[in-house]
């Protein structure tokens, strides 16, 4: 399914948040939506997801104009929004999480657990996953929780998935698991909007990019034609230079080394080295 958003405007009182913004997503395309905090990314995607309504502008799916007055209408049109804070219940099995709010029932009115498990298994088969639908969500690592959210979107027949900072709480191996799933979805013609500040990840997984700055679309194109430096410059509006800070004092021998330090759910995969005579900023 092809998406085009054209001339999208949105104001909150006197604050003009989106100024005639355009955005496009092709079938089976992973597009990075980039911008500093407050650039308008969330507002634009909340309009696509039916959470907000634009003041003006058009949303077209496969060339047909659409209006979404609620998230349910957006979802019915094939658009799923996976927020940064995952919407999963740890004390329920995977298959029940997959059907929250849309539980399948028998004629008797009781939950049809068998049918929900079967449908969940079919989605997992489509994605090449070996997860047991009856596994409790609390037993999953962060990457598989993200994958369960993606699976739920596919169960609802989503053709476009919006992912808001999907790798923020993931370790490098977990990120690779999620990226492997995204590559499969690309092959299955599912479009992905990938909202992220991690530009190296954008270069690795995305096909295209769109950059917003101060409510205006300032750049878009193919990822293969730009560098992370280019993307950062588009985002902030000026050249980004790296400065080496510090007192210049000579440091001594290594006194402390941390590698892959993790304490769920507070932090994970922390590396740190401290040397004698050094003041280390954290």
Task: Please report, for each region that a protein language model flagged, where it lies by residue.
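Glycine-rich phosphate-binding loops of nucleotide-dependent enzymes
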Residues: 1-282
């Amino acid at each position: 399914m092809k998406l085009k958003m054209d001339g999208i405007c949105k104001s909150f009182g006197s604050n003009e948040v989106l100024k005639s913004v355009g955005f496009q997503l092709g079938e089976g395309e992973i597009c990075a939506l980039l911008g500093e905090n407050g650039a308008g990314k969330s507002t634009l995607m909340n309009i696509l997801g039916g959470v907000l309504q634009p003041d003006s502008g058009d949303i077209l799916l496969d060339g047909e104009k659409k209006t979404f007055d609620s998230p349910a209408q957006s979802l019915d049109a094939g658009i799923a929004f996976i927020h940064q804070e995952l919407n999963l219940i740890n004390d329920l099995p995977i298959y029940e999480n997959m059907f929250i709010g849309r539980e399948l029932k028998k004629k008797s009115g009781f939950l049809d657990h068998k049918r929900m498990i079967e449908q969940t298994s079919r989605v997992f088969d489509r994605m090449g996953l070996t997860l047991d639908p009856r596994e409790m969500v609390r037993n999953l690592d962060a990457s598989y929780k993200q994958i369960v959210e993606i699976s739920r979107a596919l169960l609802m027949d989503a053709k476009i998935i919006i992912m808001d900072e999907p790798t923020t709480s993931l370790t490098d191996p977990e990120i690779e698991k999620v990226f492997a799933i995204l590559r499969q979805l690309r092959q299955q013609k599912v479009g992905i909007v990938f909202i992220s500040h991690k530009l190296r990840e954008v270069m690795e997984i995305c096909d295209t990019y769109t950059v917003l700055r101060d409510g205006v679309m300032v750049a878009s194109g193919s990822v293969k034609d730009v560098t992370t430096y280019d993307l950062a410059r588009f985002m902030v509006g000026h050249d980004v230079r790296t400065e080496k800070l510090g007192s210049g004092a000579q440091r001594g021998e290594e006194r402390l080394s941390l590698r892959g330090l993790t304490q769920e759910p507070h932090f994970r995969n922390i590396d740190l080295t401290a040397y004698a005579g050094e003041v280390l900023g954290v």
